[in-house]
Amino acid sequence: MAKKNKPDVVNKMVLPQCLNDIIKNSDAKIIVPETKEELIDLAMGGKDKLTNDVSFEVNGKEVKEGTVVKCKNGIVINFDDPAMRRRDPNSMVIADDLPTDKPTHMERFGTPFEPIRNETFDWLKSQESLIVVPFYAGNVSMGITYPCMAVVPGNSACFATALAELQGFIPCSKVPNYFKPKAVIYVAPTFRHTHYDGKQIVVHNRLYDMQEIFSYNLYLGPSAKKGVYSILLHIGEQEGWVTLHASTVKVVTPYELELTIMHEGASGGGKSEMTEPIHREDDGKVLLATNSITGEETYVGISDTATLYPVTDDMALAHPSLQNNSKKLVVCDAEYGWFLRVNHIDQYGTEPETEKACCHPKEPLVFLNMNAVPGSTCLIWDHIEDAPGVPCPNPRVIMPRKLKNNIVNGTAEIDVRSFGIRTPPTTKEHPDYGIIGMFHVLPPALAWIWRLVAPRGFANPSIIDAGGNQMKSEGVGSYWPFATGKKVDQANLLLKQILSTPSTRYILIPNQYIGVYKVGFAGEWVTREYLSRRGGAKFKQEQLEDARCSILGYVPKSVKIDGTPINPGLLKVNIQGRVGNEAYDIGAKKLTDFFKEQLKQFDTPELDPLGKKIIDAVMNDASVQEFYDLIPKL
């Protein structure tokens, strides 16, 4: 018999038996929210409360996970454990027996997941209240809708509120008849303490006609954010398409030339920055580079910058229904709200547009890892500390797309796909892989290779990385941490995508350092301005020369923006006096050896034959021309 406190809307849903049992046969009060205001009140534990501790009983003791503070401009979620403030790249485990290259629950923990799955359901049934959040993964306005649901214990309502800000949600009164979720996220924070040694663990269970995600921690990154990404990747793997890990921006110059750039790469690779306005000094100049040894500064005078029309921040849906006859890749956004990292905003005036949007929003926002005084304004440059004097490197705000200026709500045809990598300082005394110039032009075969290897790069702020600054791979597509299946399947999908969009071109952009020069993201912004001023004109072979390291493709012979030539050493790192050929070649070998090691895993019978030829070319130290010849487009 169904219990009391069950809203009628649950009877309209077609739910899996286990979820139906939780909702209809437990004593928990079931809440299907109607408004954002209701979700915020739930997160605060009451309409008039200004603070709310998120606590659970674990083995007879109260364990506090974090605190929610109500400010004038939104709510601030702060977790007590610094390890819960950013994503652990090893959080995903697979519970099912479908093909996967990810660690399974049995492999990692030595136990089957099914008993823990049943314990999770029993624990959820024992809660005083459960918040059920129906939502669509995909893009509602474009008609790409995959029904999903989250089931969240009442005292973790901050998670439900944040998820609704990231993915959108279907109000209780708008849930359609026969709503049948293709994926369900179950949230049970106590299990990280009772079963998983306090670690971030998200278990994925792919069933015949749906996917279950068990989030055993409250940090949004691996579940409410990337968990939904994994849902789209799993569906795309079955249907033959990809959701790309990319920001996208339409750039319109003062001369009304247009260019649409999609920027891919590992976390910290410059995706959010690609949609940001260029940062200027007080006198209006752009600080492009600072010599890390001498302190000498290089400025660029850019009189009028382009107008930016953001399309995507992190997840670009390349669904088959969007593609057209342009021979360019066509994408739309897969997110309702953007999970913006603001660690670079450390004082007032750093990024006025974002600061204004956060300090005076049109509706309350959700912040993470920020200092918060109840009833005051949360200031996005005031980050909490992981330890005394050590600011948290991952302060975040969830910014609904509708609150962004100049947002593009439809599709975008991609002129240029860029790929970002964080690079370290590189000198004769300390040779490293910071040998990439301000931008490189990649033939499509090399563009595919970079997406297979996806180096995570130097000083990544977004994730927990115990390995320091050793080079690591984010994995195929740079979205591999969120995928559940086989790497080779994603590699084949990416190659198919490149071959089917021959009019989209490819570049490589480093950030942080170019040789001895500290650049941050300035090189990315200046490259964007330069390419947009070209109006999408293709590079001719005579304007390019082979990079000294062949996997870096081509370098432009010269770059001039608004009449100012760019220092040639920022284009060809080996000619920097502090670097030279010898240090460059040491860095090139480090980079090439890393690529060769990472590419071995793709050499399987399932790999597309052309893909095998491209990988063989890397293994055999092919020339740039040989890479071009494999897919002869530029």
Identify the function of each model-found stretch.
Residues 2-65, 340-634:
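Conserved NTP phosphate-binding and transfer environment spanning the P-loop NTPase/kinase superfamily
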Residues 2-221:
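Long, basic/Gly/Ser/Thr-rich N-terminal segments
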Residues 140, 221, 269-272, 282-284, ...:
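Flexible loop/turn segments at secondary-structure boundaries
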Residues 143-148, 275-276, 321-325, 344, ...:
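Short acidic, glycine/serine/threonine-rich loops at helix termini
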Residues 221-254:
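N-terminal pre-Walker A segment at the start of P-loop NTPase domains
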Residues 256-286:
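Glycine-rich phosphate-binding P-loop
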Residues 260-262, 325-339, 521-532:
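Conserved, well-ordered active-site substructure
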Residues 287-288, 292-382:
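Conserved nucleotide-sensing/catalytic segment adjacent to the nucleotide-binding pocket
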